[in-house]
Amino acid sequence: EDNTVLEAVLALPVKYRVPIHLYYYENYKTPEIAKILGKGESTVRSLLSRGREKLKVILKEEYDFE
């Protein structure tokens, strides 16, 4: 199951993949990710939110759950 989630993360477009990876796999907080990426905190929150939505779509296709 962990591999499936990782594969789904890797399938994301890079603009969503990087913040998702930093947040969930490297345990960075939103302000830290904003500094790393040179973006505003609100932008990072939006990227994380949109990335999560895209992950749901990918995983729903994989597992066919709602």
Task: Name each model feature, range by range.
Residues P19-Y23:
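A short pre-motif secondary-structure segment
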Residues P31-E32, S42:
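Residues within helix-turn-helix
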Residues L37-E61:
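DNA-recognition helix of helix-turn-helix
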Residues T4-P13:
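Short amphipathic alpha-helical boundary/capping segments
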Residues D2, Y16-R17, R52:
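Short, leucine-enriched amphipathic alpha-helices that occur as contiguous helical runs
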Residues F65-E66:
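Intrinsically disordered, low-complexity basic tails/linkers immediately adjacent to helix-turn-helix/homeobox/MYB/SANT
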